[in-house]
């Protein structure tokens, strides 16, 4: 049976694969996403490019250690009126982000990369425009 190496420590991404009966093994890439994002922002990269590059970087880095397996890397960013919002580090940050998004249209960009032997096999991204409901 095919096993996917998940270049992530995300419990949500692992659960999605598990729910679809996809054998997987999480192996986080341990890249410093903030450093990569800041570098790409300085180069005026779009949110789509930032998400795609992070997904590729994660998958390619981990795949060097698992030459016989497919490695899945993924990344999501939120664009709120030109400001990139990263995933929260804790519950308080999550609440602050939700307050910031409250009642405002924002963009969710998610990218997925499949890599083998340190080289990209496939990459795709999805761009969704989402309204955030006004809190009562």
Predicted regions and their residues:
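Residue-level signal for inorganic ion chemistry
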Residues: 17, 55, 75, 94, ...
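Active-site-adjacent loop/tail segments of enzyme domains
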Residues: 76-106
């Amino acid at each position: 049976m095919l096993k996917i190496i998940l270049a992530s420590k995300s419990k949500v991404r692992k659960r999605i694969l598990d729910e679809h009966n996809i054998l997987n093994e999480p192996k986080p890439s341990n890249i410093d996403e903030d450093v990569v994002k800041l570098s790409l922002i300085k180069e005026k990269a779009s949110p789509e490019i930032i998400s795609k590059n992070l997904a590729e970087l994660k998958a390619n880095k981990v795949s060097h250690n698992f030459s016989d397996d497919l490695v899945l890397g993924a990344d999501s960013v939120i664009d709120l009126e030109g400001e990139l919002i990263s995933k929260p580090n804790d519950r308080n940050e999550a609440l602050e982000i939700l307050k910031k998004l409250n009642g405002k249209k924002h963009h969710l960009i998610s990218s997925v990369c499949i890599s083998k032997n340190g080289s990209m096999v496939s990459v795709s991204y999805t761009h969704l425009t989402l309204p955030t409901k006004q809190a009562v």
